[in-house]
A protein has these predicted regions:
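Non-catalytic interaction/Regulatory regions outside core domains
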Residues: 1-108
Length: 108
């Protein structure tokens, strides 16, 4: 008999808990948007308008894919976090490959 983990099952977070986490992130000073996407670029949750959400999800998913490849090629372990400093603020990206999700926080 295989354990649930061995068969590829993942512990799923409830929608209620996810919304509580997102609300807590959004309440932080300077946060202007939070997006959760899967590794294929499909938005799972967002507090941004639909067009911006889809744009962020697609672009960040592509960037994370490139970053994962770079880290693997450089033999630097595994990617845990990316920060992009921009003229408008900061984009914090936390990919979780084992769970198949990417958390994106846009800050002023």
């Amino acid at each position: 008999m295989h354990s649930r983990k061995q068969r590829g099952f993942r512990k799923l977070i409830t929608q209620e808990k996810l919304q509580a986490i997102l609300a807590r992130l959004k309440s932080q000073e300077g946060v202007r948007g939070v997006v959760v996407t899967n590794m294929e670029g499909l938005p799972l949750s967002s507090d941004l308008d639909p067009e911006t959400t889809e744009n962020v999800a697609a672009i960040i998913t592509s960037l994370v894919g490139k970053a994962l490849d770079a880290v693997r090629e450089l033999r630097e372990g595994s990617l845990s976090f990316l920060t992009l400093d921009t003229t408008k603020g900061q984009i914090n990206i936390a990919p979780d490959v084992s769970e198949g999700v990417i958390l994106v926080v846009l800050k002023n």
